[in-house]
Amino acid sequence: MSDHKLVTEWFRYANNDLIVAKHCFNDLYPKQTEIAGYHCQQCAEKALKAFLIFNSMEPPKIHDLRVLCKMCKDINPSFLEIANQCSRLTAYGVATRYPDELVPDINMITLAIIEAQQVYDFCLEKIK
């Protein structure tokens, strides 16, 4: 697969995660906040990794958005603008997958969806 096609696929998968997050939060009752949070983290992770691939870097097999954002910042210092979003979204990658770890409330997921969209849009803009 060409690098361009691979980057496109990473962004497609990231967008799908965002769609799932919004569906779990907006369309299901009761709201599936833990699943929505997980997919917000996944959206941001895949968008950051797409940016790294676009810049000919092999993304590490990690889920810590803070590390991925720092790697992106080393390429483009403007990634500092989304560092706080990445830091907050990191918690949803593991803790929401297990009972009694993190049960996000409605306000937390409302913010997580907004921030996942911000990270996605930011990364996409940086490859144009």
Where does each model-flagged region fall?
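Terminal alpha-helical segments
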Residues: 1-128
